[in-house]
C-alpha cells in the first residue's frame, strides 16, 4: 500500500495509514477474486496499490494539495501540471470513493517474473497520460490498460476516466458512506 510509506506524491506516509494493509468490503473482495481467476488464465495477476482510504487520509491529500511550497515530488508525479490545478483537474478531491471500501487501485503483473506490465505511465501520475484511453500511450500499453479495464468491468467494477488503475465496485454496499477508521 503506497500511502503507508513515502513512495507517493507527497513523499511521506499519509495520515490514517498505520500499516500497509488492503481493506475492502466483502463484495469487492469477491469480485476481485473473480478478476484474479480470469487473469490467472493468462499468467497474469493483480498488484494492489490502494484499497480503503480513511477520510482523514483524503483530508491529508487535500491539505498537501493546498500547500504550494511542497513541490518535492513534482518531477515524479505531476511534472506537467501546476499543483494549484490538482483539484480543478480532478486529481485530488475533498472526498474519495476509496473511503467507502469498494474502490481499488491496481495494475497487472506477470506472475512468473513478478514484473508489472507496461501501462504507459506510473501509478498516481497526475497527467492526461494516465487517462485509460490516452492517445499518446504506446499501443501495447494501451492494450494492457484495456485488458485490465475489460476484465474489471466484466466483473462488476467501473473505471475512473482520469486514472487507468482506479476501479469502484458498481454495486458497492455503502454508496453514501465515507468511513474514517484507521488502517492498522
Where are these regions (language model features)?
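Extracytoplasmic cell-surface/polysaccharide-interacting catalytic and binding patches
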Residues: 1-51, 58-59, 63-162, 171-184
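Conserved metal-phosphate-binding beta-hairpin within the catalytic cores
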Residues: 167
